[in-house]
């Protein structure tokens, strides 16, 4: 399937250890930073999702663009995040997003 003309795709990504953020550069020239602690990283066991152990900086540095730019992939962690969801502020399953929104304070 061909990409839509206006589809925002990742062209590069990297982990910034100093700020513990994921940087994503898109095909529209924009760059986005996402704190990695906001990303829900889980594994499926016995039909349940459980958090993975806290990843090391070395593991997080091994991130790449995947699926023609439609996803970000950590192979060693077996974690995939869709770019369109990340750009929409969706960092995990609905349950995770509810927990995240409960921790946000508005000044």
Enumerate the predicted regions with their spans.
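Motif-centric detector for short Cys/His coordination patterns
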Residues: 1-107
């Amino acid at each position: 399937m061909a990409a839509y003309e206006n589809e925002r795709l990742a062209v590069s990504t990297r982990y910034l250890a100093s700020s513990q953020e994921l940087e994503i550069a898109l095909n529209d020239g924009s760059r986005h930073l996402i704190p990695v602690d906001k990303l829900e990283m889980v594994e499926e066991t016995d039909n349940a999702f459980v958090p993975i152990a806290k990843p090391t900086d070395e593991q997080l540095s091994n991130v790449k663009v995947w699926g023609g730019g439609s996803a970000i992939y950590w192979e060693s962690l077996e974690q995939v995040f869709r770019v369109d969801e990340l750009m929409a502020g969706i960092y995990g399953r609905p349950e995770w997003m509810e927990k995240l929104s409960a921790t946000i304070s508005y000044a």
